[in-house]
A protein has these predicted regions:
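A short acidic/small-residue loop/turn micro-motif
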Residues: 143, 236-238
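Short, gly/Ser/Thr-rich active-site loops of penicillin-recognizing serine hydrolases
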Residues: 239-268
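Residue-level structural signal for beta-strand termini and adjacent loop
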Residues: 210-212, 219, 234
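Short, surface-exposed loop or secondary-structure junction motifs
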Residues: 9-212
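Conserved hydrophobic/aromatic "anchor" residues
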Residues: 1-4, 162
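Short, surface-exposed beta-strand/loop micro-motifs that present aromatic residues
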Residues: 206, 215-228
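Active-site micro-motifs of SAM-dependent methyltransferase domains
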Residues: 3, 7, 101, 237
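Short beta-strand segments enriched in hydrophobic/aromatic residues
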Residues: 83, 166, 224, 232-235
Length: 268
């Protein structure tokens, strides 16, 4: 696995482990910072995953591997490329074969190149246009720029099924779940495991994750009693925050979502 990663990163990954990628302690720079632009400028463009990694590797490392935690979308791009390198199949095929089909999911998929729409009935998503300052419909977009870091499409009920079946040992082994839950405490997330966040709720620890793409944000978790909740909103915090560049303002915009998660899982 390490040899495959070293080939993908053209030698830059010789000291980075898969665990560090999953736990965001790799030190890889954020590719979205390297290609930062308004989604309104690139919504119709297809981007190749390899280009994202190249853009990230053109920048200096954020820190030495294993030194600290910093959530970085680049880690998921590398993991997606690593899956394709090792299996000789596309990421979408692997997700379908290993997750979607075994769980009988009908509305969960990784969009194919050029697919800019959400299949079936769906809510519209909105993003603040930096030019006009207004919230505008951004539902139709090419999600390739997020790829393994956030391009998946699903429904709330199927996300709940996925999370429950992963954490109860149906989809992966109990030992793998235990490894995923070996976490480190962070300033920005309660506890971060291997692609899992441990949320400290009023009724105990809930395990889940979530994600954002312009126009949509999700937060999901499985509570101590095995119940699952997924919350979706149709604008990300930076789009509705009073100060889109201020951390406190963004955090305040996200807080009601976290409170709703606690209320739904704990009945508080």
């Amino acid at each position: 696995m390490s040899a495959a990663f070293n080939k993908i990163s053209r030698g830059a990954g010789s000291r980075i482990t898969v665990r560090q990628l999953l736990q965001h302690t790799s030190g890889l720079p954020e590719y979205t910072d390297a290609i930062a632009t308004s989604i309104f400028e690139v919504r119709d463009e297809y981007r190749f995953p390899r280009d994202f990694l190249d853009a990230a590797l053109a920048r200096p490392a954020a820190f030495q591997p294993g030194e600290k935690f910093a959530y970085t979308n680049t880690n998921y791009i590398v993991l997606g490329l690593l899956i394709e390198k090792v299996t000789k199949r596309t990421l979408g095929e692997q997700i379908d074969q290993r997750i979607v089909q075994p769980l009988g999911l009908l509305h969960t998929y990784l969009p194919a190149p050029g697919d800019r729409t959400i299949h079936g009935k769906h809510p519209e998503g909105y993003e603040r246009n930096p030019v006009s300052g207004e919230l505008e419909n951004i539902t139709e977009q090419d999600p390739s720029w997020a790829w393994a870091a956030g391009a998946m499409i699903s429904t709330l009920s199927e996300l709940n099924i996925f999370m429950q079946k992963m954490l109860d040992g149906t989809l992966i082994t109990a030992d793998s779940v235990a490894e995923m839950q070996k976490s480190i405490h962070t300033e920005t997330h309660s506890d971060y495991g291997l692609g899992l966040i441990g949320y400290s709720l009023s009724c105990g620890t809930a395990w889940g994750h979530g994600g954002t793409i312009p126009g949509h944000q999700t937060l999901n978790a499985v509570g101590p009693d095995g119940g699952a909740v997924t919350i979706a909103v149709t604008a990300i915090p930076t789009a509705v925050a009073k100060d889109p560049t201020g951390e406190e303002s963004i955090r305040a915009a996200f807080e009601p979502i976290k409170e709703a998660l606690d209320n739904l899982l704990c009945g508080s």
